Amino acid sequence: MNFTVIIPARYASSRLPRKPLLDIAGKPMIQHVWEKAQQAGATRVIIATDHPEIEATAKAFGAEVCMTSDQHNSGTERLAEVIEKMQIADNEIIVNVQGDEPLIPPVIVSQVAENLDRCQVNMATLAVKLTTKEELFNPNAVKALADKNGMALYFSRAPIPFARDHFADCDDAFVASQNYLRHIGIYAYRAGFVKQYVAWQPTQLEQLESLEQLRALWYGEKIHIELAKQAPQVGVDTQEDLERVRRILA
């Protein structure tokens, strides 16, 4: 099966300046992500960046690079620009892998592409089971709710579904016994759909939750959710995250 991985790599970061270029075990962070995408069996891996320093660094380790605008409001807008510039066919499967996830398991990159290939939808993603009360009530852990066919009903930062009769005694054991899902921020799209997605006006719902995928649901698209074969470790958002990843990859 053919699929293309696009890795958005934005230069500006309020918490970690030059984040994609930060050294981890002798390599820039973006190279670790690129290597994981290669290991996933992608037909093509493209780094999409808005800065010449990232472009030069990526080309030096052999990556294909597409320069994009620095005015995009989301990673999906950057994907759409790459699809247009590279003239990627509408039926091509695109996997969006974040440029700050050097520990992403290659198996889930290929899994989300295969998931989309099997389903008659334009967008697919992955989730893992929630097992702790702390995660359930953590707004940074996005919850996903799917129907019997694995189609997304909703994504939220709130605990969904809400256990009305167990709110007072909700503990880790109860959470683990239910089918609560934590969304993993990896997506596969059909390339033509990405262009449609960015043509839609942003919705109040996605802005309220700060969850971009809600735009697709609002406009009536289906998103297929599959349980990930391997739970990924967290990406790099803070200096503490960076130091932890450096220790793991040392």
Curated annotation (Swiss-Prot):
Location(s) in or outside the cell: Cytoplasm
Claim: GTP-binding is one of the keywords in the record: no
Gene: kdsB
Keywords: Cytoplasm, Lipopolysaccharide biosynthesis, Nucleotidyltransferase, Transferase
Major enzyme class: transferase
Pathway: Nucleotide-sugar biosynthesis; CMP-3-deoxy-D-manno-octulosonate biosynthesis; CMP-3-deoxy-D-manno-octulosonate from 3-deoxy-D-manno-octulosonate and CTP: step 1/1; Bacterial outer membrane biogenesis; lipopolysaccharide biosynthesis
GO-annotated molecular function: 3-deoxy-manno-octulosonate cytidylyltransferase activity
Presence of the UniProt keyword Cytoplasm in the record: yes
Catalytic activity: 3-deoxy-alpha-D-manno-oct-2-ulosonate + CTP = CMP-3-deoxy-beta-D-manno-octulosonate + diphosphate
Organism whose genome encodes this protein: Actinobacillus pleuropneumoniae serotype 3 (strain JL03)
GO cellular component: cytosol
GO biological process, one term: CMP-keto-3-deoxy-D-manno-octulosonic acid biosynthetic process
Protein name: 3-deoxy-manno-octulosonate cytidylyltransferase
EC number per UniProt: 2.7.7.38
Entry similarity comment: Belongs to the KdsB family.
Top-rank lineage group of the source organism: Bacteria
Role: Activates KDO (a required 8-carbon sugar) for incorporation into bacterial lipopolysaccharide in Gram-negative bacteria.
Pfam families in the record: CTP_transf_3
